[in-house]
A protein has these predicted regions:
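Conserved class I S-adenosyl-L-methionine
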Residues: 1-47
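Class I SAM-dependent methyltransferase SAM/SAH-binding core
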Residues: 50-91
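A short glycine-rich, Lys/Arg-flanked "PGG" loop and its adjoining helix->strand segment in the class I
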Residues: 118-130
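A short acidic, Gly/Pro-enriched loop at the edge of an enzyme's catalytic core
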Residues: 90-100
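C-terminal lobe and adjacent flexible extensions of AdoMet/dcAdoMet transferase-like proteins
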Residues: 200-241
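SAM-dependent methyltransferase
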Residues: 135-206
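A short SAM/SAH-binding and catalytic strip from SAM-dependent methyltransferases
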Residues: 99-115
Length: 241
C-alpha cells in the first residue's frame, strides 16, 4: 500500500536518524541566531519533523512554534513545552511576525519546483520581522553523488521492519528515497520521497527576487564560506528594507 511521505516513516524515523548529533546541530542553530538575530524573541521552525532540535532550543526563545507538513511527525514529538502546528512551509497561515525563522534537515529540498521554493521565500518574508533572520540548510549535488551513492539500508524499529533504497538521478537533479515498511503481518507500506538538488546559484537568484539579501552562505555546520565541493550549505537571509 502506497502512503504519503512520513505517514509510516514517522514510526521508524528515530532509527533512520540515530547517528545524527542533534545536540551539536541545535547548538549550531543557536549560534546562528546569536550572530544574526540576537533578540531571541519569537521563533518559527519549519519542517520540525520529530522535534529533536525543537526540544533542545525552544527554552531559549520567548515564544517557539514548531511546524511540519506531516501531522504524523508532529504527533511523535514527546516534549509538550512548545507550540506545534501542521502546515505547508510554502503557504504559511500566520498573521504575526517572528524574529527568527529556520528550517533544518534539508527540508527545503522537498520543494521540487522553483515556484514552490520562491513561494517559501515570499511566505517567510511576510512573517519575518524587518530585523529578523531566516536560516536554512540544503543538500547539494556533491552530497548526492559522493556521500549517498545507490544504497540499501534495512532495520527494525517499534515492531516494524523497513528497507530504504536511495539513489540520485543527475539529469533531473532529483534525489530519491524509497521506503518499504512492514509490520510483520499483512500490512506492507511504500513511501516515496523526492528531493530537488538545486544549483547553489538558484537560491541566490530567488532570494533577491523575493526581497531578501543573502547575509551568509556557510559550509554547513561551520562558519566558513561555502566551497564548490561542499556537501551542504547553510543560508542566512535578511530582508531588504
Amino acid at each position: 500500500m502506497k502512503v504519503r511521505p512520513y505517514e509510516k516513516v514517522s514510526l521508524i524515523y528515530d532509527s533512520l536518524m540515530e547517528k545524527v548529533d542533534y545536540s551539536s546541530w541545535a547548538a549550531y542553530i543557536l549560534k546562528i541566531a546569536q550572530l544574526h538575530s540576537p533578540k531571541f524573541g519569537k521563533s518559527l521552525e519549519l519542517g520540525a519533523g520529530s522535534g529533536k532540535i525543537s526540544e533542545q532550543i525552544y527554552k531559549r526563545f520567548k515564544y517557539y512554534l514548531a511546524t511540519d507538513i506531516s501531522f504524523q511527525m508532529l504527533k511523535s514529538i514527546e516534549d509538550n513545552g512548545f507550540h506545534r502546528l501542521c502546515c505547508n512551509m510554502a503557504s504559511l497561515p500566520f498573521k504575526t511576525n517572528f524574529d527568527f525563522i529556520f528550517s533544518a534537515f534539508d527540508s527545503v529540498n522537498y520543494l521540487l519546483r522553483q515556484k514552490d521554493l520562491a513561494a517559501l521565500f515570499r511566505e517567510v518574508s511576510k512573517v519575518l520581522d524587518d530585523e529578523g533572520s531566516f536560516t536554512f540548510d540544503v543538500s547539494l549535488e556533491s552530497n548526492s553523488i559522493y556521500l549517498v551513492r545507490p544504497q540499501t539500508i534495512q532495520g527494525r524499529k517499534n515492531g516494524f521492519w523497513y528497507e530504504r533504497i536511495s539513489f540520485y538521478k543527475k539529469l533531473s537533479r532529483i534525489h530519491h528515497n524509497r521506503f518499504y515498511i512492514s509490520d510483520g503481518h499483512s500490512n506492507n507500506y511504500r513511501e516515496y520521497h523526492k528531493q530537488k538538488i538545486y544549483k547553489l546559484e538558484t537560491y541566490f537568484k530567488l532570494a533577491e527576487s523575493c526581497g531578501f539579501k543573502v547575509s551568509a552562505c556557510y559550509d554547513c555546520f561551520t562558519f566558513n564560506d561555502i566551497k564548490s565541493n561542499s556537501n551542504r550549505a547553510q543560508f542566512v537571509f535578511k530582508k531588504i528594507n
